[in-house]
Amino acid sequence: MGAKLTHRGLRTIATIAIILGLITFWVLRPIRETDFATPGFTPLKDDLLAAKFAPVVLGHELYGAPTRLLYRMARNTKGEVFIAYHPFYPAEENPHKGFGAFMNRIIYTGGLHLKDIMFGPADIELIEVVLDKDGKPTLMAYEDAEKYNPSAFSVRHLAKSVNNPRQPFCFTTPAWNHMFALADASRCAGKVALKAEYFSEPEWVQYRMVKKTEAILRRNRMHRVYERIGAN
């Protein structure tokens, strides 16, 4: 009887090990390799230019406000300048009631901290401004929340862009995961943008912005291809 139990126990352990191995393989298997080449772009660092076009992001009483504004910049062969601003939040959490919001707190942003495992620490978003060769803004791109439901587990991202945007670039924070909604300039009257700081290579690595190989639980963070090589 003892031998049968022992064999049964070994089979159970072996079965569990195989299942865990398959799950691990599925989770960690490579999805895609990241191409770190940035053909046609020359990285730049210009704090004054970055400050000139820095967006103003208004905080939310429940969702908080960015504490830093990081940036990377590049020029293409046409002379256009691309500025990727990264509003930086120390953390993100859905404070609302509801089963989905609760599960998010114990699985994604807290508890198991899947967000940190998948992407990296803190919450780093993206607002892009493109200038023509004469320094005039021709495009602004960002992500808003689509059909926002604060009680849901997740927030759907909706990419938006504005041609020939006019300053000041004023945004509100409509969702707990720090998406952006373009607001009337009057909302930002008297407000000053955060100091634009160059996104240094040590911090770029620290916050795991780009992964060499993406997997189910290892994903690149929001960025543009031209940011993958920093300015010296």
Question: Which residues does each PLM region occupy?
Answer:
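N-terminal Sec-pathway targeting helices
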Residues: G2-I19
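Hydrophobic alpha-helical membrane-insertion segments, chiefly the h-region
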Residues: I19-V27
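A domain-level signal for the mature, folded cores of soluble proteins
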Residues: V27-E125, L131-D132, K136-N232
